Amino acid sequence: GYTYKCPHCDISLTYHKTKNHLRCHYCGYTVIKSDICPNCQEKSIDDYGLGTEKVEEFVKTLYPSYSVVRMDTDTTSKKGSHERIIKDIEAHKYDIIIGTQMIAKGLDFPNVTLVGVVNADESLNLPDFRSGENTFNLLTQVSGRAGRGNLKGKVIIQTFNPENKTLNFVKNADYMGNYTYEMGVRHMLSYPPYCYLVLIRVSSKDYDILSTEANKVVQYLRRSLNESSKVLGPTTASPFKVNNVFRFQIIIKYKFDENIKPAIDFIDKEYAMNRDISVDIDINPLRI
C-alpha cells in the first residue's frame, strides 16, 4: 500500500486523528489527510499501526462506561495541561490511563493495579547496542506503576517474541541475569564498557559533497589511529535525511589510543568553517 512520507526527511508521516493531519515528528511538516490514495486514486483508505490515539479509540469502544485519559505529546503540549492531567489522575477522575513513555517515569499513580504494554518489541529492535538495556529499564519502570502500596498489581506485555531473553528477565525481575547477559553480548561484540566509542556525524544538503567528505574523514582516521582501533563507516544515519539535510555517521571503537584526541581535534578544526559540511563529534554517545 501507499505510505505517506515527509518530502524533507527520510521518515514516514504520523497520522493525528484529532486534527486529521499527517505530521513529520522531525521537521514539523504537516499535510491534511486525503480520502483518496495519491498513488492509485482509490477511496478505500485505511490507517494501520497502533499509536496512543488508536489505542484510546479501541479502549473506549470496549469499555464505554469507563473514563479514559490519554497522556502524550499532543495532550500535554499546551501550558499547564501536563500538570492538570496528573492532578486529575491523582484525584481518581479516570479509570484508564493511556500514554507514551512519559507515564512510565517518575510518576506515582495510586490505585493502579493493571499495566499493559503494547508492542514491546519496538524498542528491542532499534539499531543500538543499548536497546536491550533501555527496554529492560523502561519495562521495569512501567511495571512499577502497578500494585503501589498494599494493592496487588499485574503487568501484561504484548510481544511477537515471548522467548526473548530481555523480556523474560523483565518478567522474572532478574536484574543480575539481565546484567550478566548484556555484559556477555557487549564483551563478545566489543561495545562499552569493554571499549570507548566516538560517534562522528557528517551532514550536508548536497549528497555528493557529503559522500566525498565522509569518506575522506574515514580514510584520515584509518591512517592516523592505531591498528587496534576500529573505524566503522561511513553509513547512513537514522533517519538518513532530516529537513533536507543528508546524514552519514562514522563510529570509532578503541581501548587505548594516544592518537584519538589529536585526530578528533584535527577533524573538528578542518570542518569548523566549512559551510557545505557540518561535523558533530560525540564522545561515548548515549545513542548511536
Name each model feature, range by range.
Residues 213-219, 260-270:
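Short amphipathic alpha-helices in soluble, non-transmembrane regions
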Residues 116, 235-237, 242-254:
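Solvent-exposed, membrane-proximal periplasmic/extracellular interface segments of envelope transport
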Residues 1-201, 206-211, 223, 250, ...:
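Inter-lobe coupling/hinge segments of SF2-like helicase ATPases
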Residues 233-243, 279-288:
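Short proline/glycine- and acidic-rich turn/helix-capping motifs at secondary-structure junctions
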Residues 63-66, 221-230, 272-276:
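Short secondary-structure junctions
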Residues 194-198, 244-248, 275-277:
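Residues at beta-strand starts and edge strands
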Residues 68, 155, 229-231, 279-281:
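Generic structural signal for residues in well-ordered beta-strands
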Residues 248-263, 277, 284-286:
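Short, charged interaction patches at domain edges and termini
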